Amino acid sequence: MSENIRESISAKTLSKDQMETSYVSLKTWIEDSLDLFKNDLLPLLYPLFIHIYFDLIQQNKTDEAKEFFEKYRGDHYNKSEEIKQFESIYTVQHIHENNFAYTFKNSKYHLSMGRYAFDLLINFLEERNLTYILKILNQHLDIKVYVGPKSEERPQGIETSVVDAEIDLTTFLVSRECEDAILGDEQYRYDHLETYVLQLRKQREMKPKDSVYKPNASQIHAEIEKLKDLCKRVAVNKNNLPSICCYTIHNTYEGLTAAEISNDLKLMACGFKDSYVEVYSLTNESLKKLKSSSELAKSDIKTLNEEKFEEVGSSYKLVGHSGPVYGLKFFSSNKFLVSSSQDCTVCLWSLDLLCLLAVYKAHAFPVWCVDVAPNDYFFASGAGDRQAIVWSVMTSKPERLIISSLSDVTAVKFHPNSSYLFTGSSDHRVRMHDISTASVVRIFCGHTDTVTCMDVSHCGKFLASGSKDRTVLLWDIQSSKLLGKYVGHENTVFSVSFCFYGSVLASCGADNSVRLWDRTDHKGGCLGTYYTKNTPLLCVKFGYRNIISCTGPFIS
C-alpha cells in the first residue's frame, strides 16, 4: 500500500459499538460518494466486514460478533458463497480449522483503486480519526493505486501465490498407435486420411512425447472415426458460424440435474434427482446391449459377431446411485460412462453391458463434477470436501488427492495431453495441477463467483471458464494471463466448448441461450445469440465436424 497510510494501531481494545461505528461511518461515506469513485471504494467494505467479525471473535465476544455479522451480511449479497462459509465460525479455533477463513485472515486481500479515490479515502479516515480501519487496511489489504483509466483487470480477493512452474503443453490429436494403424492399413492407402495422418506424424516427430498408457483396440477405433469426422469438418469463423442442434428433454418435472453429450455427438446421458442415469441414442440406431453368456452359448459360432448384441430401444436407465446425479462424462471410446452424485460416490458404467461396473468411494461430501482424461485411463471428480481426486480405471483407490481449493470443487477438466488437471471452485479460482505430482502449476484469478464449467482448446494452449458471475473468461495457459472477458449471459453459464481448428467458442446457460464468441476478439464481442423457448441449457459441445449440439429440460 502507499506510504501515505501511516501505521496507527490503537493501544486499547475497541468495543463492538466502536468497531461497528467505524464500519458504518465508512460505509455511509462510500454510499454517499460520487458514482465516479463509488465503484472503486465499495469493494473495501467486504474485507473490512470480515476482519471486524474476526476481531470480535478473537476478543471472545461471540454473541456480539454474530449480531454484527447478521446485521450487515446483507450488504455483501454478491459474496453469498463465501458468507455461508463464515456463518458457522464462532471461536478462534473455528478460524484455524476452517481452511478458507484461516487463509482469509492471514493473507492480503487484493484491490485496485484510482489515485483520486484513494486520496479521498485516506483523508476521510484521518479526518475522522478512524485508526482502527487504517490498521486493517495496513495489515490485511493490498491496494494497487492506478492513475488514469484502468489499464488491466486485476483480480480482487485474497492473495494467492504466483505459480510459474515449467509446464509442457505439447498435445497430439490422436495416439501414435492410431497413426500406426492407419498408415499400416491397406484400406487407407492413398486415401485423404493417410495424407492427414502423415501431417500429424510430422508434428509428432518435431515434438516427440509418448504416453506410457497404450490405447486398446476400441480406443484406436474411436480415434480413427474421430479423424474421419475431422477430415469432413466445416470451417467455422466469425463469418461462417456453425449449425446448432438442440435436444429438449420433456416431462422432467424439474428433476433433471445433469446432462452430457458424447464427443462424437452420438450419445447423450442425463442425470436425475431420482438417482438414476438415462442414456439416449442421438442417431437412428438403437442402443445395444451385450447378451448374457448363456444366450451367447446358444448362438451359432458363424453368426456370433452379428448376434452378440440385442437392441434395447432409443434410451436405457442405469440405476445405482442413492442420491441426485450431479456429474456425467463419456469416455472417448463410448464404451464407458462415469457419473457422480450427492451420495458421495463416483460410478463407472459399461455401455456395452448397460450395467454398473464399479463404485469409487473417497469423498466425504456430495460429488459435484467429473471428467475423463483423453487417454481414457484416468478420470477425475470434484466434491464439496474441497478435494479433487484422480482415479484410474484399473483400481478403485485414488491415484491422486488434489487439495488446493479453499471451497467446493465445482468443475474439473483434463488438459488434452492428459498430464494436467484444471479445477474450478466456489472460491472463484481455477487451478492447474500436474497430475504426476498433484502440485499446483498455475492459478487463474478473474471470476467473481463460483466457477461452473471449463474447456481447453484442442491445441492445448487456451482455457475457457464459465461462472455464476455470468461471464466466460479466456486464458492463455502458459502465462496464466486473462486474454478475453465475454459478457452477455443473463444467468449462470453452465457449459463452454471450443471448436476444432477455428476461433469460435460456444457457451450456454440458465438464460435459455447459446452464445457464440470469437476467440481472437479479446474485447468480448458476441457473434450470435440463439434462444430456446423455455429450456435452460446444461451442456453445449462442438462435434468433430464443428456442428454444435446442446441439451436441456423444457420448463413448463
Curated annotation (Swiss-Prot):
WD repeats lie at residues 251-291, 320-359, 362-401, 404-443, 446-485, 488-527. PANTHER family: CANNONBALL-RELATED (PTHR19879:SF1), TRANSCRIPTION INITIATION FACTOR TFIID (PTHR19879). It is found in: Nucleus. Keywords: Nucleus, Repeat, Transcription, Transcription regulation, WD repeat. Its main location: nucleus. This is Transcription initiation factor TFIID subunit 5. Component of the TFIID and SAGA complexes. TFIID is composed of TATA binding protein (TBP) and a number of TBP-associated factors (TAFs). GO terms for biological process: transcription initiation at RNA polymerase II promoter. TAFs are components of the transcription factor IID (TFIID) complex that are essential for mediating regulation of RNA polymerase transcription. Regulates the genes involved in ubiquitin-dependent proteolysis during the progression of M-phase of mitosis. InterPro entries: G-protein_beta_WD-40_rep, TFIID_NTD2, TFIID_NTD2_sf, WD40/YVTN_repeat-like_dom_sf, WD40_repeat_CS, WD40_repeat_dom_sf, WD40_rpt. One of its GO terms (molecular function) is RNA polymerase II general transcription initiation factor activity. One of its GO terms (cellular component) is transcription factor TFIID complex. Belongs to the WD repeat TAF5 family.
